[in-house]
């Protein structure tokens, strides 16, 4: 369970029955969850860790505005995952509990 403020996200990975594979490069405009953003405190370390675990990134982390870093990639199942590093003092920061 991922918690941030008053919101939570619970992620499942089914082993049985064996899930059917879907198109791994399906467009993000298709129905269903197509994009998950995770706020991290060290985007460089998470980028390297996830890349080693099989995630394919579209690009290395890039600066957005003056103080935010972001990158997008696809996990081994084709899900689009965004990594976002926002300084704690930024009004956009979400503090996980």
Identify the meaning behind each predicted range.
Residues 83-85:
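Conserved SAM-binding loop
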Residues 1-37, 47-74, 87-97:
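Vicinal oxygen chelate
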């Amino acid at each position: 369970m991922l918690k941030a403020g008053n919101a939570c996200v619970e992620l499942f990975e089914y082993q049985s029955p064996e899930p059917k594979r879907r198109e791994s490069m399906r467009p993000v405009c298709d129905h269903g969850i197509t994009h998950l953003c995770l706020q991290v405190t060290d985007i460089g370390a998470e980028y390297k860790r996830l890349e080693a675990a099989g995630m394919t990134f579209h690009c290395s982390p890039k600066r957005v505005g003056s103080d935010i870093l972001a990158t997008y990639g696809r996990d081994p199942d084709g899900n689009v995952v965004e990594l976002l590093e926002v300084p704690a003092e930024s009004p956009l920061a979400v503090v996980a509990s």
